[in-house]
């Protein structure tokens, strides 16, 4: 297997581990969020789970199609309990995912996988939307009280 393709597969497996972690993190956050924000944030966290699992499914399929073996292990998952920290952990996760996908997009371009480049751009757009929504939630001064 070409070394550049192998590096791409390794990166995609790292991305996959983080998508698993994001789905678990959002599931955890939906369960533990409490107080006045629970009624608003629980559905928000729950709505993100399917997006992250959709990304994980795509990554798994692509890794296998490229000749790799999809990981079954999730990346480390923070477990904050306060509303602000739940949102901040999610925000950091989304930012890191965008950065990883930008790197993966460059790797895919280098080996000529246009379909993967296009899908990564779509996933970057999804993650950017998640990031912006969390930033709006964090801009509420009551979250910081």
Walk through the language-model features, giving the residues of each.
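Iron-associated oxidoreductase/ferritin-like identity signal
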Residues: 1-145
């Amino acid at each position: 297997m070409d070394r550049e393709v192998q590096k791409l597969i390794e990166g995609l497996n790292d991305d996959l581990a983080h998508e698993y972690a994001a789905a678990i993190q959002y599931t955890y956050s939906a369960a533990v969020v409490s107080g006045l924000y629970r009624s608003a944030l629980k559905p928000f966290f729950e709505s993100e789970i399917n997006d992250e699992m959709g990304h994980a499914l795509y990554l798994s399929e692509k890794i296998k199609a490229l000749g790799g073996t999809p990981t079954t292990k999730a990346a480390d998952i923070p477990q904050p309990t306060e509303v602000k920290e739940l949102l901040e952990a999610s925000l950091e996760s989304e930012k890191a995912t965008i950065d990883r996908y930008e790197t993966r997009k460059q790797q895919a371009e280098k080996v000529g996988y246009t379909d993967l480049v296009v899908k990564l751009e779509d996933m970057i757009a999804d993650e950017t939307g998640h990031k912006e929504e969390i930033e709006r939630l964090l801009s509420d001064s009551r979250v910081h009280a």
